[in-house]
Design a protein with these regions (language model features):
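Catalytic-loop region of hydrolases
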Residues: 23-95
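C-terminal subdomain of alpha/beta-hydrolase-fold enzymes, centered on the catalytic histidine
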Residues: 372-604
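Short amphipathic alpha-helix adjacent to the substrate-entry channel of hydrolases
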Residues: 120-140
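Primarily recognizes the serine-hydrolase "nucleophile elbow" in alpha/beta-hydrolase
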Residues: 168-247, 325, 330-340
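Sec-dependent signal peptide cleavage junction
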Residues: 14-24
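Short beta-strand element of the alpha/beta-hydrolase
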Residues: 64, 80-86, 96-112, 116, ...
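Alpha/beta-hydrolase active-site loop
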Residues: 151-172, 594-598
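Disordered, low-complexity segments in secreted/periplasmic proteins that are enriched in proline
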Residues: 23-24, 325-398, 463
Length: 605
């Protein structure tokens, strides 16, 4: 009898929940399974214009397309160009069935730009073609999303809503809904990292509710692929100066003070972050005779990562070798990995040329990828780099070339090392053991990784950087968000503007510190933050970066990788840096698309 009553109560509760769901906020309509279209050349069934938000903030962006391998459906031709489809559970493509197939959601948002949803069958989705994935048995969720002009957390909110919508239709769609993977580059890599770190975070609940997202499904993902993620924005300015401040010249006394002050703040941040290496060694910074806190186990880790990156390049590259360009170093070649660890790194640091003491002193247009047609960056990496920097609307210096310029053909590895040392020896290489040693992280950045952004890199004092717009308030105007920089500018002409912006509230009553936490994967992954263990992070991570990019500090990716690795036992982190590449879909060998697909396959085993 008690069991019967318990069952009846559970049934009544379920009916009550269904009633509340129906009578409360509206929800998106489910997929109409009679409206599928078919691309015979690729054997793909697809639908576009699917609204994942019942009350969208911007309906021109907040729809999605779904692209399904043909074998996963049994289809009946409706005679009007559409098909009625049901899941064919025995359908198989590659190593997957209609039941076990993973799903991917591309995040093609350079500079945190908006991403238009597809309006038809798109051969390209920004990271290779649709058929690159469907031919391997992978289902593609191609969602539009608002961009930086709408203000954080609009973009990630939209991608979360799209993921929830796919799961809302799990009774109709093929695929393993527990195996969704995000992928992105640059600002897209950052938002992919956020999707991976912030699964089911309560901070997003009011924003999801505001657009009428499905509130009964999860937005957590299994894996996150991040190329050159521009993230960890609460400390990004400070990391940039610690890493590349030594490459600046011609700074005023005030500018030098800001650079040095931010570098010092980064050292304090690292020493409170609690990072450890794969052996459990605490990674910290210490004061140094030269530079600003250029010593300690964290510094040694960074230095080792740079050395390993060059070692990988030398082992991977066939000589004679022709450098791809005169700016920077190398071309398509190896990316680094940490010696002895299961993921490598790239990070570095040297602040401004000062002594660590702070002196006493009193916007581009967002890209809009019309009609859902994404540029295909699956070709040569040099082309990718140019494309991203032209499209992302981020302010950079007119000249970003490093002090050392490599071009032409190098007959031997010894010739290449000699070219690296053309302006003074800072690299030695033991040919027998393929062991590289550099004199310092500062020598590396001075030679090959110059700052390409002004002070501060992500938080321009005139509010003109793309990230300023990201933390604006939906009107396309920039706002200040860096609380550390706000302290450094006290007593200057910028003090009032910083104070006013940091106190503003968005439409849901949140100040920028809350929104900054929502857009910081470390907030969820690191025990140093209040958001630790308040989300369901991804179990699989793949992070790649071009080691010579001037777009963000090397610390960005390594801190993310270390925090993700330490979050939970069994978390898989595949992290490497790529020698000779910059701000691009950097890969040590092979193509970014093929390598991503292979990684997904490994995660699914």
């Amino acid at each position: 009898m008690k069991k019967f009553l318990a069952c009846m109560m559970a049934f009544a509760l379920m009916l009550s929940c269904v009633s509340c769901f129906a009578e409360g906020e509206s929800v998106p309509a489910k997929i109409d399974m009679t409206k599928w279209q078919y691309e015979a050349a690729d054997d793909v069934y697809w639908q576009v214009g699917l609204s994942y938000a019942a009350t969208p903030a911007d309906s021109s962006y907040e729809t999605m397309g779904i692209f399904v391998p043909g074998a996963y459906f049994t289809a009946a031709d409706n005679g009007d160009g559409t098909y009625t489809c049901t899941v064919n559970e025995s359908g198989t493509v590659g190593q997957y069935t209609a039941v076990t197939a993973p799903l991917i959601i591309p995040v093609n948002t350079p500079g945190y730009s908006a991403m238009a949803a597809p309006t038809g069958y798109s051969s390209s989705m920004g990271y290779g073609s649709i058929s690159d994935y469907t031919s391997e048995g992978i289902i593609v969720l191609f969602a539009g999303a608002r961009g930086r002009d709408a203000g954080a957390p609009a973009g990630v909110t939209d991608f979360k809503a799209a993921i929830r919508y796919a799961r809302y239709n799990k009774d109709l769609l093929p695929g393993d809904m527990d195996s969704i993977f995000s992928l992105g580059m640059s600002g897209g890599g950052a938002q992919s990292a956020l999707i991976g770190a912030s699964g089911n975070s309560d901070l997003y609940t009011p924003y999801l509710a505001a657009i009428g997202a499905v509130m009964t499904e999860s937005d957590a993902v299994k894996g996150s692929m991040c190329w050159c993620p521009i993230t960890n924005l609460d400390i990004a300015d400070e990391a940039y100066e610690w890493n590349m401040g030594n490459t600046r010249s011609g700074l005023s006394e005030e500018e030098q003070a800001y650079s040095d002050g931010m570098a010092l703040a980064f050292a304090e941040y690292i020493n409170g972050l609690g990072l450890t290496d794969e052996n459990g060694t605490a990674l910290v910074l210490a004061e140094s005779e030269e530079g600003i806190w250029q010593s300690g186990t964290y510094y040694d880790y960074v230095k080792d990562v740079i050395e390993t990156s060059l070692e990988h390049f030398l082992s991977d590259t066939e000589f004679p070798y022709t450098a791809a360009s005169s700016g920077g170093f190398g071309g398509r070649g190896g990316r680094g990995g940490m010696r002895g660890g299961n993921f490598g790194g790239t990070e570095g640091g040297f602040a401004g040329p000062g002594n660590g003491e702070i002196p006493d002193f009193g916007n581009g247009e967002k890209p809009d990828f019309a009609n859902g047609e994404m540029p295909d960056f699956g070709g040569e990496n040099a082309e990718q780099e140019t494309a991203y920097e032209e499209m992302d609307g981020i302010t950079r210096a007119e000249s970003t070339s490093s002090a050392l310029s490599l071009s032409g053909t190098y007959e031997t590895k010894q010739d290449y090392i000699a070219a690296l040392n053309a302006n003074g020896e800072w690299v030695t290489w033991d040919e027998e053991t393929n062991t590289v040693t550099i004199t310092s992280v500062a020598a590396f950045t001075q030679a090959l990784k110059n700052a390409s952004k002004g002070i501060a890199a992500f938080e321009q004092l005139d509010r003109g950087q793309g990230e300023n717009t990201l933390f604006g308030y939906g009107d396309g105007n920039g706002a200040h968000f860096d609380a550390i920089l706000a302290e450094l500018v006290q007593g200057s002409e910028y003090e009032t503007a910083f104070a006013e912006d940091l106190a503003k509230q968005d439409a849901l009553g949140n100040t920028v510190d809350v929104r900054l936490n929502m857009y910081n994967p470390m907030y969820y992954l690191s025990p140093a933050y209040e958001g630790y263990q308040t989300s369901e992070p991804a179990a699989c991570w793949r992070i790649r970066t071009g080691i010579n990019q001037g777009d963000t500090a090397l610390c960005t990716e390594i801190d993310l990788a270390l925090a993700a690795e330490a979050y939970a036992e069994g978390t898989q982190v595949d992290f490497e840096t790529v020698w000779g590449q910059g701000h691009t879909e950097a890969e040590r060998t092979g193509s970014s698309t093929a390598n991503f697909i292979a990684w997904v396959q490994e995660c699914m085993k």
